């Protein structure tokens, strides 16, 4: 199995990806945006869940784009475009993305503008991962204003570690998963 090429901040943890993608509700043939794609690890898992997924991996950081491209190649991810720039601009009316069915947002810079653009594109479901409380509050407020707020899930993961010949658990940083759904 291939190893993920990492960047600062590392890839999203597998447990967080699993819950995030479950909340996203990907379907075969969806157009999927991975905003703040980092290593592309979320897109790689999304491609395993939904067949014929069209992926738009977006990040403003050069190191993230290079890591994502390397990881996509290593994991055989096709039907993916790696896009450099600010998500709010790339998702805007002048951008190169026509429509999005589902979006994962791991990069929360300009979260209000990103959410607005995704709603304009009639995105069915949006999942935002955040570790900072202020980001969670801004995201919830923006989603409520846009009429798409569904729920927040707080996840704390602990991993086993050896201690004195026995086992203890070491906690990882908790993550908030904020879910937005298009209202019928």
From Swiss-Prot:
Keywords noted in UniProt: Cobalamin biosynthesis, Methyltransferase, S-adenosyl-L-methionine, Transferase
Catalytic activity: Co-precorrin-6B + S-adenosyl-L-methionine = Co-precorrin-7 + S-adenosyl-L-homocysteine + CO2
Enzyme Commission code: 2.1.1.196
One term of GO molecular function: protein methyltransferase activity
InterPro entries in alphabetical order: CbiT, Cbl_synth_MTase_CbiT, Cobalamin_biosynth_MTase, Methyltranfer_dom, SAM-dependent_MTases_sf
Pfam family, one: Methyltransf_31
The keyword Amino-acid biosynthesis is assigned to this record: no
Pathway(s) the chain acts in: Cofactor biosynthesis; adenosylcobalamin biosynthesis; cob(II)yrinate a,c-diamide from sirohydrochlorin (anaerobic route): step 8/10
Amino acids binding S-adenosyl-L-methionine: 12, 36-40, 59, 87
The UniProt record lists the keyword Cell membrane: no
GO BP term, pick one: methylation
Top-level division of the source organism's lineage: Archaea
Family the UniProt entry places it in: Belongs to the methyltransferase superfamily. Archaeal-type CbiT family.
HAMAP family on file: CbiT
Name of the protein described by the UniProt record: Probable cobalt-precorrin-6B C(15)-methyltransferase (decarboxylating)
Native source organism of the sequence: Methanosarcina acetivorans (strain ATCC 35395 / DSM 2834 / JCM 12185 / C2A)
Lineage of producing organism: Archaea, Methanobacteriati, Methanobacteriota, Stenosarchaea group, Methanomicrobia
Name of the gene: cbiT
């Amino acid at each position: 199995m291939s190893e993920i090429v990492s960047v600062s901040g590392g890839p999203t943890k597998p447990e967080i990806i699993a819950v995030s993608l479950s909340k996203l509700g990907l379907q075969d043939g969806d157009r999927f945006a991975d905003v703040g794609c980092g290593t592309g690890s979320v897109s790689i898992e999304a491609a395993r869940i939904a067949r014929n997924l069209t992926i738009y991996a977006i990040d403003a950081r050069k190191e993230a784009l290079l890591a994502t491209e390397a990881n996509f190649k290593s994991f055989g991810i096709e039907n993916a475009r790696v896009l450099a720039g600010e998500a709010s601009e790339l998702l805007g009316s002048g951008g190169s993305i026509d429509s999005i069915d589902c979006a994962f947002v791991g990069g929360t810079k300009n979260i209000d503008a990103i959410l607005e653009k995704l709603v304009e594109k009639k995105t069915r479901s949006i999942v935002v991962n955040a570790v900072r409380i202020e980001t969670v509050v801004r995201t919830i407020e923006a989603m409520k204003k846009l009429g798409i707020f569904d729920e927040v899930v707080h996840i704390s993961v602990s991993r086993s570690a050896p201690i004195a010949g026995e086992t203890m658990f070491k906690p990882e940083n908790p993550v908030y998963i904020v879910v937005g759904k298009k209202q019928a």
